[in-house]
Amino acid sequence: METITVFGPKHGSPLSLPSRTNMCWEMKPSRFPLTSVRGKPAKQVGLKVSASCDRPISKLPPSKWTNYFHSVLVDVSEMDVLEREIEALKPNVREMLMSSKGYDSVKKRSLMIYLLVSLGLAYHFEEEIEKSLKDGFEKIDEIIAGEDDLYTISTIFWVFRTYGYNMSSDVFRRFKEENGKFKESLIEDARGMLSLYEAAHLGTTTDYILDEALDFASNNLVSLAEDGMCPSHLSTHIRNALSISQHWNMEIIVAVQYIRFYEQEVGHDEMLLKFAKLNFNLVQRLYLQEVKILTKWYKDQDIHSKLPPYYRPVVTEMHFFSTATFFEPQFSHARILQTKLFMAELLVDDTCDRYATFSEVESLINSLQRWAPDDAMDTHPDYLKVVFKFILNAFEECEKELRPQGRSYSLEQTKEEYKRFAKSNLDLAKLAQAGNVPSFEEYMEVGKDEIGAFVIVAGSLMGMDNIDAVEAYDFLKSRSKFSQSSAEIVRYLNDLAGFEDDMRRGCVSTGLNCYMNQYGVTETEVFREFRKMVMNTCKIMNEEFLKTTDVPLRVLKTNFSCVRSGFVGYNEGEGVTYPEGKITKYLTSLYVDQI
């Protein structure tokens, strides 16, 4: 079995990717002739962004979550009690983390840090974690020299790489036979194999041993999860990891799943488990409070009744994706701002994707570049003015929040990224007007902006008040290899997940079709190639993360968060447009189910 199984089944089945976008936007509609196989004549397909006003509407099913929490009561006094209980436990957990002394202290602290990260608790102890890892990394080779436990080595490696320390992958050579293969005896250690699998997802382009480790661990974990030899809770944990690895999963999803797993582990720490449950219960109540605020805000806009039925409100779904960057309680306002920005992005994308004519797209995007209606706006249907006004209102809401805090710079920079994102919709439409299928490189040049990854990162930075905003946005605007790789991953994921839906709707201007047209490959081959590109670009992103030492970790994490939400959104098909499957399960576990 090749590593590709980690990134999803063969073509024809729902995708199951490791480890995020577009989390929030689907692939552009049919804008080019269908020439996916060389040697065949082009088949002209009607454009979504055409001059015609006879436009078929692709109706989307209503979201079950629109009014779901309308009558839910959130007891603020109960939240106060939870906060007090959490604060009372923090000193004890801090003592657990820092009390380890002596030769094995780095090992013990690293294992404890992994627990804190997995349970969603690490943000409480950022300073302690950073100090522990900084001190420990200076002597890590000496400390692990005689360690031969697979779980311990893999977990330590995962922790240091996750926090930006370039621990050598050579540590895994101790687990190989003389013939160069991993020891067969390791297969019996289910927890060790799972930890090896997780560590392998932090590999770079030169960590060849981690490529081998991923193949070895993936193949054997499938058998371990299915043969009934593992406890049921461990089998479930393995299946969750095989669906999306921890490194590429949203932290809050990992926390929900890990709390349930940890509770069933023999010898778990009761105080730590209680701390994790209290923390999640507080977070869950905050999320419900925020969704109620956002739902009311959206209804007050009165936009849905004024738009053709190509668009549906997905406020709760967009709030869910905002937790990819901001899952911690202290970022409540940031989640609200990010959700409003997501709604503004989604509306532009759906308008250009599913309904607008070319002239309407041109007018809308030109107006957004000016941040004022262009001369042609009055000649178009009223719905276009509704779309434009909603976007401006969303940014005005953000301005009301940020300007009094002296954070106008962040707002303006996010607005500029939004304009660039919006313009990419028009750029794709203009390529269509040329009447030629673009090269895959031309498509990606526009598609990396159109997918929305950069504006998502900009919106994430806008929600942070503890960073150097000028430095952070300068890094984003530099379009570093690290940032570019995050956008590329999201683009590939979106193209893979949305391909069948795009083709059903007559949309052929997809990345896969551009690639097939340029290289003369089949659908099966292009799916395989795109999965490889996802895997390779993930390695590049990991590599650039370790190299980028002059940018704060919190800033770099915004790119990872964007990609993670892409993996979650596209894990089983186009989960944003059609969230009724896995996304609904995530929403239920996060907003409804009690822990």
From Swiss-Prot:
Gene for this chain: TPS16
UniProt EC number: 4.2.3.-
Subcellular location, record wording: Cytoplasm
Family statement drawn from the similarity comment of this UniProt entry: Belongs to the terpene synthase family. Tpsa subfamily.
Manganese as UniProt keyword: yes
Comment field on protein domains: The Asp-Asp-Xaa-Xaa-Asp/Glu (DDXXD/E) motif is important for the catalytic activity, presumably through binding to Mg(2+).
GO molecular function: magnesium ion binding; terpene synthase activity
Protein name (record): Putative terpenoid synthase 16
Biological processes per GO annotation: diterpenoid biosynthetic process
Residue window of motif DDXXD motif: 349-353
Pfam families attached to this UniProt entry: Terpene_synth, Terpene_synth_C
Cofactor binding description: Binds 3 Mg(2+) or Mn(2+) ions per subunit.
Necessary cofactors: Mg(2+); Mn(2+)
Keywords, alphabetical: Cytoplasm, Lyase, Magnesium, Manganese, Metal-binding
Entry binding sites for Mg(2+) 1: 349, 353
Source organism (scientific name): Arabidopsis thaliana (Mouse-ear cress)
Top EC group: lyase
Binding residues for Mg(2+) 2: 349, 353
Classification of source organism: Eukaryota, Viridiplantae, Streptophyta, Embryophyta, Tracheophyta
Binding site for Mg(2+) 3: 494, 502
